């Protein structure tokens, strides 16, 4: 291995050290590599030079904890969308074990990485229903469209439920138009909890699932007065004692005032 630049620079300013090349190399090796450094850590730092040095020191065929480290490194690279790392690891270790690389690339919206891994997968990694659900829940429409076109199993109701919870109305609308799985009452309940007024409105007008009493309670607990008022008018629901208690605990006095006005009418 070449001597680290930092060690070489110090050696140049020391006549004694500079004359002892074997000592210089030993210092470089000691500084350069530690068993504390894993491939996954190198990948998380986006440092492919460090990754290569770790592999040289360990040896490509070192099995001491390396299988889990290799798979973890691949997953970290896929989750972060680091195509260079992904390609290097898959080409260096084509016979790796089963990983969640496809799912992590999809859920984080890295379509280029997802497509590459899917094309070069070793048969152990599969594109799961959860990958579709996570991609939808996180608002990655390009990934959702690609998975819709390239896999037959589709998604579950969690796709629309989670998209609604996170306020991704465009995903909810796309799933409604192109998929048959639909959603559950959790879609409106979660959207109300997070204060996504437009999502709640759209779901009530375009879907049949409706909501549960959790919707207005969650909206009230989180101080979303506009939603509380709208749900009361359009869904014929009222706040429970629990919602009042949570609103009071969190200082949402405007919610308590509104509830008081409703109770007086």
From Swiss-Prot:
Localization per record: Secreted; Host nucleus; Host cytoplasm
GO cellular component: extracellular region; host cell cytoplasm; host cell nucleus
Signal peptide as annotated in the record: 1-14
Entries under Pfam families matching the protein: Ank_2
ANK repeat placement: 34-64, 69-97, 98-126, 128-157, 159-183, 184-213, 215-240
Secreted keyword on record: yes
Glycosylation sites: 150, 236
Keyword Transmembrane helix (UniProt): no
Entry keywords, A to Z: ANK repeat, Glycoprotein, Host cytoplasm, Host nucleus, Repeat, Secreted, Signal, Virulence
Cross-referenced InterPro entries: Ankyrin_rpt, Ankyrin_rpt-contain_sf, SecEffector_AnkRepeat
Disulfide links within the chain: none
Protein role: Secreted effector that partially suppresses the host cell death induced by cell death-inducing proteins.
Family, as annotated: Belongs to the RxLR effector family.
Protein's recorded name: Secreted RxLR effector protein 124
Organism expressing this protein natively: Plasmopara viticola (Downy mildew of grapevine)
UniProt lineage: Eukaryota, Sar, Stramenopiles, Oomycota, Peronosporales
């Amino acid at each position: 291995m070449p001597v680290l630049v930092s060690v070489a620079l110090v050696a140049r300013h020391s006549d004694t050290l500079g004359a002892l090349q074997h000592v210089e190399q030993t210092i470089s090796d000691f500084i350069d590599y530690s068993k504390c450094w894993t491939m996954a850590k190198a990948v998380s730092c986006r440092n492919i030079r460090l990754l290569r040095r770790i592999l040289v020191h360990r040896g490509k065929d070192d099995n001491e904890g390396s299988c889990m480290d290799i798979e973890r490194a691949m997953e970290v690279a896929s989750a972060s969308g680091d195509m260079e790392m992904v390609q290097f690891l898959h080409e260096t270790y084509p016979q790796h074990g089963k990983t969640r690389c496809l799912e992590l690339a999809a859920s984080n919206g890295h379509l280029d990485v997802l497509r590459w891994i899917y094309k070069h997968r070793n048969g152990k990694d599969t594109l799961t229903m959860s990958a579709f659900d996570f991609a939808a829940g996180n608002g990655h429409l390009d990934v959702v469209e690609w998975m819709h076109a390239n896999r037959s199993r589709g998604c579950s109701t969690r796709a629309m439920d989670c998209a609604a919870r996170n306020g991704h109305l465009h995903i909810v609308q796309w799933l409604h138009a192109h998929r048959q799985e639909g959603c559950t009452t959790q879609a409106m309940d979660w959207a109300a909890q997070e204060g996504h007024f437009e999502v709640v409105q759209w779901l009530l007008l375009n879907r049949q699932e409706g909501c549960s009493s959790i919707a207005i309670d969650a909206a009230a607990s989180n101080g979303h007065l506009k939603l509380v008022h709208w749900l009361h008018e359009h869904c014929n629901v009222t706040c429970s004692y629990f919602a009042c208690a949570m609103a009071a605990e969190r200082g949402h006095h405007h919610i308590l005032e509104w509830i008081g006005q409703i109770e007086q009418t």
